[in-house]
Amino acid sequence: LQGFICVIGVLELPVFVTLRPGFWQFSPMRTRRSATEQLPADELFRSRLENQIDLRHPLVQLSHRLPWSALEQALSPRLPATTGTGGRPALPVRLIAGLLYLKHAYDLSDEAVCERWLENPYWQFFTGEVVFQTCVPCDPSSLTRWRQRLGEAGMEELLAHTINTAHAIKAVDARELSRVIVDTTVQEKAIAHPTDSRLLEVARKKLVLLAKRHGIALRQTYARQGPALRRKAGRYAHARQFKRMRKVLRRQRTLLGRGLRDLQRKLAQQEPSVRERISVWLERAQRLLAQRPKDKQKLYALHAPEVECMSKGKARQPYEFGVKVGIAVSARKGLIVGARSFPGNPYDGDTLAEQLEQARGLLQDVDVIPQVAIVDLGYRGRDVEGVQILHRGQAKTLTRRQWRWIKRRQAVEPVIGHLKQDCRLNRCHLKGTQGDALHVLGCAAGYNLRWLLRWIACLRAWLQVVRARSSTPSSTMWPANMALEV
């Protein structure tokens, strides 16, 4: 025992602390104990959440059916190890996983999901709280660090456990999960629409800011002429005076080149650490200065060089700027069984093997292997070993049953639409290629959560109808020839 004095008011009380064996050794990441372990069965002044809310609510029912303990065991190896005195314990895994589920299921930002959690007792119950909390669960920036800790494999676990839950409650069976529909779409990045005049002006401002931050005096910053040229280029483009617009763009390139060369000359006198920090932006500015409208692999955003330009043939939006993502859904009920990003804008057929490999990994807990993949003509010319590929280009060899499955191919389109409008897939705010990969997996997990909530609500409504029908004579309420539908 090691003792010390604790001063409480004017009293000095000896306090004894027992150091457990291995106190200073490294151990797996410590997490805060769950609310059920910290609080007694009941309190005098605070009522438990289960006594205040409707336990038949779909979110409450789903919280009882999600395998939280299995999810914690799957995510624990991916969390960093800490020492016994590593500061405050980390937040519970269930709390973070629940917030990530709710964020994408209800189309909210990190800040908004924490604020809504504070107001909603059902959300607090879903994340494992026992009594109503009156402070936010965590700082919104903690969700960013947790996403980085989990990585792509951890986010895949969140998606896989929604599939396991759907199979466990018999919302889908194994035979339905063996047939999947695969399609690709574009996950747009949170950038402004790229125009030459805007990009050149942004690069000039960035170089001036870097020089000022590190105490480098440039000969000229063009603080007045740069914004004026950008506005002038926009007016000329709107008036379709393209010859004048191109003249303004040449002038903007001249100003950017002058500032770039001036900064490069004076950077040689700086410390190596300063040169290393600025060299990244100098390379991007040089790349922007050299590119032309017809070039390939252009730079579309100074802060996001991974952004690519893709054309999907949409009349209202000919070009989209982001990354290609693949979506795999069950052929009959539309449950997402695979979602991943494909940097580099590859041919759709070249993504099929990787997409089905991911789906196979996500379905391994339910002991299902995708056997049939229904695709569009963009996947022609590619085969995957062990999987039957169906598309309408095989018209002469298809059976009538296979044609019926091909007619289900367009069922993936509304799933993609709901992913974009309801689950935040239409705009990715996360940084880099890793952010693109994490975001699409979070959107898919949020969509599956909405799918499960909808299934539970429909089941409850169906049971209410059956109960009402059994308690009411069929001759008075239900005609004999009326089918029971939900």
Where are these regions (language model features)?
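Electropositive, glycine- and tryptophan-enriched low-complexity nucleic-acid-binding patches
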Residues: 314-362
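Flexible, glycine/threonine-enriched loop-and-boundary segments that flank and lead into catalytic domains
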Residues: 301-320
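Secondary-structure capping and boundary motifs in well-ordered enzyme cores
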Residues: 51, 67, 87-95, 135-138, ...
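Active-site- or DNA-interface-adjacent structural scaffold in DNA-acting proteins
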Residues: 17, 130-306
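Short, conserved catalytic/metal-binding motifs centered on acidic residues
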Residues: 57, 97-99, 113-117, 137-143, ...
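Charged, often Cys/His-bearing segments associated with DNA-binding zinc-finger transcription factors
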Residues: 2-77, 452-486
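Helix-centered, glycine/charged polyanion-binding patches within enzymatic domains
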Residues: 364-438
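Basic, low-complexity intrinsically disordered segments
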Residues: 30-32, 74, 78-97, 104-170
